[in-house]
Amino acid sequence: MPWSSFAAPSRRYGALVALLFAAACSGDSLLTAPGAGRDVVPPPPPPHYPILFVHGFNASAATWLTMVGRFKTDGYTDQELVNFSYDYRLSNATTAQTIAKKVDSVLLATGAHHVDIITHSMGALSARYYVRNLLPIGDRRVDAVVNLGGTNHGTITAFGCTPISCTEMRPYSSFVTKLNATDETWGTPRYATWWSACDEVIYPQTSAKLSGAVNTQTACLRHSDLHENFTVYTQVRDLVKQTPQGL
């Protein structure tokens, strides 16, 4: 048999060995896509902190459509604006667990190290419960907690409804009492509230204020106007666009 008949397979075998050796040195396998199994590089942090929006009782994510649209106009992306609906009949402690998952998810998705939480009405209770009871002491992942017409000290209008979340909003309920015990602005976040003397849902209207927070009285706005009013929006935006903890 001619020598060439042996030489060709030998050359092919040598080429295969060289290919396998090169793959081994590079860390890639012929059975997997190049780069598979390598550490995924997280995205760089955005120029501002992402925002989580928490609506109130008998409401939904539709609460925030106007404000979310304004934040987009001012340079925020869809990924940085987390607006979701939840079952408002459940305990605010249960909703706080949902908030915890949403916060961790948006931080992972955006590469950010901190998040701002903007709430309306009852949403203030679950957000504050999350910071106080579900975050480790000294944890800094939440930069700011913003309450618009928050039920921070309860409201007498909550005597008109019966779900557990609503009973938790009643003045001097065990939920509100424990949440406000010792320190109303718990932990490391910046706290800010906006309240209106014309709020027909929060009564007394000053119930929305927090000791230790920056409390801003608005113009004569109704409860649902607090998240629609442009002046309130600009004030909230100017607060959350700050990055005091760095990026």
Predicted feature residues:
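C-terminal motif of bacterial Sec signal peptides marking the signal peptidase cleavage site
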Residues: A22-A24
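Residue-level signal for mature regions of secreted extracellular proteins and peptides
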Residues: A18-L19
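Bacterial N-terminal signal peptides that target proteins for export
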Residues: M1-A15
